[in-house]
Amino acid sequence: MRLPVLGKDTVRMRDPEGLQDKITRIQRGGQEKLQIISDFDMTLSRFSRNGERCPTCYNIIDNSNIISDEGRKKLKCLFDIYYPLEIDPKKSIEEKYPLMVEWWSKAHDLFYEQRIQKDRLAQVVKESQATLRDGYDLFFNSLYQREIPLFIFSAGIGDVLEEIIRQAGVFHPNTKVVSNYMDFDDNGILTGFKGDLIHTYNKNSSVLKDTEYFKEISHRTNILLLGDTLGDLTMADGVSTVENIIKIGFLNDKVEELTEQFLQSYDIVLLRDETLDVVNGILQFVTAKN
């Protein structure tokens, strides 16, 4: 039986029959064996609304009044240089890797110069255009109610990401976030970022020093992985035993050029789909009691 939600016109599948087999196997395993691993920016959050681009965690800071006009220009200049390289279909991940380190490092240096205050972040998020994808409440709340762990692995800013989810009223105890977290001094002024830099193309076990999380849930060998770049495909590398994994890719930009590449790697590719309908549909099916 094919799930009706997979008939949506935004859905592309590499191997519909193989996918259905995986869905059935995950359903048989039950919710006790399931975990979710997801990217945040442009995966759980929207890419656009009414034709306007929605901001990433970094954009929220870049575009806010806690950054000077001069700082904003410099950050925009970095975006204009590096974003096209990040999504360039002709460049390999190996070529993109050092470029992403450059971009993130330069952006962080600009942030330090701005002496960002911790107590202003909540207001900055509130005033931003950041929006979670339609269906986010069902997604976060049903995972919490069913005690299914949600691991968010983000190259964004952890403090901002958490605030977005908190302000939406869906930040629950089953959610664990690994991201770039800001480090503040005793006066609440940004002095740096904690731990290793996480960027688009190193979201793998190399930055997951704290794998205690995956050890604790090692019995959860079925995974739904959600991402929006080819760099997100390695997010489950920290899981020691994987029985079944369904990879769902949100293809938001350069759709025509990247569809084929995405289909080689993701089981399901969602073309310009600003909802979590497909994810929620699969979750409802695999966690149904009968």
From Swiss-Prot:
NCBIfam families: HAD-SF-IE
A cellular component term, taken from the record's GO annotations: cytoplasm
Gene: Nt5c3b-a
Binding site for CMP: E86
Protein name: 7-methylguanosine phosphate-specific 5'-nucleotidase A
Enzyme Commission no: 3.1.3.91, 3.1.3.5
Protein's job: Specifically hydrolyzes 7-methylguanosine monophosphate (m(7)GMP) to 7-methylguanosine and inorganic phosphate. The specific activity for m(7)GMP may protect cells against undesired salvage of m(7)GMP and its incorporation into nucleic acids. Also has weak activity for CMP. UMP and purine nucleotides are poor substrates.
GO biological process: nucleotide metabolic process
Nucleotide-binding in keyword set: yes
Catalytic machinery residues: D39 (nucleophile), D41 (proton donor)
Keyword set includes Transcription: no
Family: Belongs to the pyrimidine 5'-nucleotidase family.
Keyword annotations of the record: Cytoplasm, Hydrolase, Magnesium, Metal-binding, Nucleotide metabolism, Nucleotide-binding
Primary localization: cytoplasm
